[in-house]
Amino acid sequence: MEILNEPSSTYHQPVLLEESLQGLAIQPDGIYIDTTFGGGGHAKAILAQLKRGKLFAFDQDEDAESIASTWHDPNFTFIRANSRFIQRFLAYHQIEKIDGLIADLGVSSYQIDTALRGFSTRSEGPLDMRMDQSSSLTASQIVNTYSFEALTQLFRTYGELHSAPALAKALIAARTKHPIETTQSLKEIALPFSPPRKSAKFLAQVFQALRIEVNDELGALKSLLEQSLQLLKPGGRLVIISYHSLEDRLVKRFIKTGNFEGELDKDMYGNPLQPFVPVYKKAIVPTEEELVINSRSRSAKLRVGERTAL
């Protein structure tokens, strides 16, 4: 394989890389999907283990597409699209079943470090937060147009913030004076509602809530998980790396029951139908050694499910 542009450590240091590869249990002639190509860290490692196998990588970010365009490997196909459309594109490539699927749900280091993207609480930039820069909804539009009720629900549900009503009220008061257009403006409005000595975590939750709404991240995750049911062969592996409790709860529940309600379906005789078997009893977290190398992996949790014959 010829890769003209190595995945930059500043773009995305692959999180839980060895654990992900072990979870996928890669077969040299298997078919694999990386639904979050990013800087290509996981994808490169998967390709290195394939001989006649295929890797299809998805990402809606144009910067990820730029990196993928420099890869020249007959076993690799990059598709610039949201993971909601995996089945559609695989059907186009005449792929019905796959051996493994991996998704790293984190924002890439490159996206965080690029102030113009508006993801970081530490950089001054426009309040954007779009993963797909061709989409229309931005974080600025949300804080400047959503109603009190909608903002409260957003920060309470996606940010898990007790101060959601007060923050929503403050945003509405501030926007009557001038539009809220930058990350710094948002921080100045939000910080007074932070618990003592927890401002960094609080701001991260505020930004998380807006990012989830802008990109419909939980909706995309649900779609991805549901598609995995249809795509994975018996014995195929589902590997998901999540970064906050909302994602992790969805993934844990889905691997355990095959749905989002948390109860196993049953056949006509009352026997439980379990489409996945958890490979590990608990989520895998980064080692201390990895945390030293990549502090942004601190909140990562990896779960692996193996598709049954149901």
From Swiss-Prot:
<feature type="binding site">
    <location>
        <position position="111"/>
    </location>
    <ligand>
        <name>S-adenosyl-L-methionine</name>
    </ligand>
</feature>
<dbReference type="InterPro" id="IPR002903">
    <property type="entry name" value="RsmH"/>
</dbReference>
<comment type="function">
    <text>Specifically methylates the N4 position of cytidine in position 1402 (C1402) of 16S rRNA.</text>
</comment>
<dbReference type="InterPro" id="IPR023397">
    <property type="entry name" value="SAM-dep_MeTrfase_MraW_recog"/>
</dbReference>
<feature type="binding site">
    <location>
        <position position="104"/>
    </location>
    <ligand>
        <name>S-adenosyl-L-methionine</name>
    </ligand>
</feature>
<dbReference type="GO" id="GO:0071424">
    <property type="term" value="F:rRNA (cytosine-N4-)-methyltransferase activity"/>
</dbReference>
<keyword id="KW-0489">Methyltransferase</keyword>
<dbReference type="GO" id="GO:0005737">
    <property type="term" value="C:cytoplasm"/>
</dbReference>
<keyword id="KW-0949">S-adenosyl-L-methionine</keyword>
<keyword id="KW-0698">rRNA processing</keyword>
<dbReference type="Pfam" id="PF01795">
    <property type="entry name" value="Methyltransf_5"/>
</dbReference>
<feature type="binding site">
    <location>
        <position position="59"/>
    </location>
    <ligand>
        <name>S-adenosyl-L-methionine</name>
    </ligand>
</feature>
<comment type="similarity">
    <text>Belongs to the methyltransferase superfamily. RsmH family.</text>
</comment>
<feature type="binding site">
    <location>
        <begin position="40"/>
        <end position="42"/>
    </location>
    <ligand>
        <name>S-adenosyl-L-methionine</name>
    </ligand>
</feature>
<protein>
    <recommendedName>
        <fullName>Ribosomal RNA small subunit methyltransferase H</fullName>
        <ecNumber>2.1.1.199</ecNumber>
    </recommendedName>
</protein>
<keyword id="KW-0963">Cytoplasm</keyword>
<dbReference type="GO" id="GO:0070475">
    <property type="term" value="P:rRNA base methylation"/>
</dbReference>
<feature type="binding site">
    <location>
        <position position="89"/>
    </location>
    <ligand>
        <name>S-adenosyl-L-methionine</name>
    </ligand>
</feature>
<keyword id="KW-0808">Transferase</keyword>
<dbReference type="InterPro" id="IPR029063">
    <property type="entry name" value="SAM-dependent_MTases_sf"/>
</dbReference>
